[in-house]
Amino acid sequence: MAQQGPNPIEVYESVVKALMPVMAGVTAAQLNSTTPCTEWTVQSLINHALAVQVFGTSVLSKTSPDMASMGNVDHALPSEGAEAAFKSITDTTLATLKSANLEVTVKTSFGEMPGGNFIMIPITDMIIHKWDLAKATGQSATIDNALAELGIQVLTPAVAGGREGGFFGPEVIVPASASAQDRLLGLSGRTP
């Protein structure tokens, strides 16, 4: 069956393009700052963002993905720095996406699914954490409306299980007329 919805490669490129300047805008003085992810500092959040992309690449390339590594975030940033490390891993993930048959089923900790559907999970992680990182470092936290809508679409069927697993806090209720960004943030347990 063909991939339904937006082109995962184009969406991945768009999300990386949105997150890259936020990564670049983080200063060394901000690394110990708190984030909307209350258990993580800016440094921990960056390490998580890097680990999620490594995990995504491992799943798509059918190597041995380590789900636990995404939570192992209390260590120094890579020696090349956050921006360079993020560019390197997202370039690797993008190359993997471009070479993979995204209709082929991959085994994930979330169950079996086509690779094109799976990559939407790390994409949504980046969409949400772009906001977290921007808020924590005083940068523009605006999420593109189409990406926010995509995040809602991906997160809605998975959020209950994510809450049970401790990945999301309780939903923050926002008005029905709220922007897609605010609805995504509320759904993911964040106060817009």
Q: Where do the protein language model's features map onto the residues?
A:
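Glycine-rich loop at the start of a catalytic domain that most often binds anionic cofactors/ligands
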Residues: 48-49
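N-terminal cationic and glycine-rich segments that engage phosphates or anionic surfaces
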Residues: 45
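Structured surface interface patches that mediate subunit assembly and partner/cofactor docking
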Residues: 2-14, 18, 25-38, 58-70, ...
